């Protein structure tokens, strides 16, 4: 997406992701090779998660690293940052049992939000995306209902959720400013609309 500049025009990405100084990535998992004399939290061989661009080697302050539990698959651990981002929606929305939650956008952060909503005990975890592959993953992750459509084209179906009241929480994970008006229209009266990620 970034390499081929496939992001919405006139967004802050154009300023951030300019070539050739671009360093890709925002999070990494790594194995500690050496430590400084004042580091007591880690030792060589430990696996860590860090908010840092991709690279073969990094010099990091210990305070900017998080331990990965021994035995955890690093392919799973690399999702920690996205899970934390999605957790912000669960925290802000106060996800809890009995709620009716709509997630617009089933990309990586959306997939994590689906899992937070499902594990919270929500009665409905509805997901809107135009990708059948993403919606298949959404079902595996706990979505109770999926809409393979643009949000603008399925508002009537969404508003029929929760006995016609609509979703109590709408999480827009698309990063597309044009979706916001539809997210507002989809929410139940006095419902919450959460923008998660960049727009």
List the predicted regions and their residue ranges.
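Mid-domain Rossmann-like dinucleotide-binding core that forms the NAD(H)/NADP(H) cofactor-binding site
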Residues: 73-152, 156
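Short, compositionally biased
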Residues: 59-72
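Glycine-rich cofactor phosphate-binding loops and adjacent beta1-alpha1 units
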Residues: 93-95, 136, 141-199
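Short glycine-centered segments of the SAM/dcSAM-binding site in methyltransferase folds
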Residues: 47, 100, 191-193
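A structural motif shared across PLP-dependent enzymes of the aminotransferase-like
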Residues: 1, 51-62
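Glycine-rich beta-strand-centered segment in the early N-terminal region that forms part
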Residues: 2-52
């Amino acid at each position: 997406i970034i390499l081929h500049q496939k992001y919405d025009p006139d967004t802050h990405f154009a300023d951030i992701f300019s070539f050739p100084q671009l360093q890709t990535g925002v999070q990494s998992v790594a194995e500690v090779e050496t430590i400084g004399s004042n580091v007591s939290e880690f030792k060589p061989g430990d696996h860590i998660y860090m908010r840092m661009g991709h690279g073969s080697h990094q010099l990091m302050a210990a305070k900017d690293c998080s331990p990965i539990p021994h035995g955890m698959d690093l392919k799973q651990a690399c999702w920690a940052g996205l899970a934390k981002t999605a957790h912000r929606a669960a925290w802000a929305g106060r996800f809890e049992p009995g709620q009716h939650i709509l997630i617009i956008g089933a990309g990586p952060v959306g997939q994590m939000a689906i899992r937070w909503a499902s594990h919270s005990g929500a009665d409905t975890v509805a997901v809107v995306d135009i990708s059948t592959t993403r919606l298949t993953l959404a079902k595996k992750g706990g979505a109770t209902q999926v809409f393979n459509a643009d949000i603008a084209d399925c508002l009537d179906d969404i508003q029929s959720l929760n006995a016609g009241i609509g979703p109590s929480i709408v999480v827009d994970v698309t990063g597309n400013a044009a979706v916001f008006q539809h997210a507002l229209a989809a929410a139940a009266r006095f419902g919450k609309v959460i923008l998660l990620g960049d727009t």
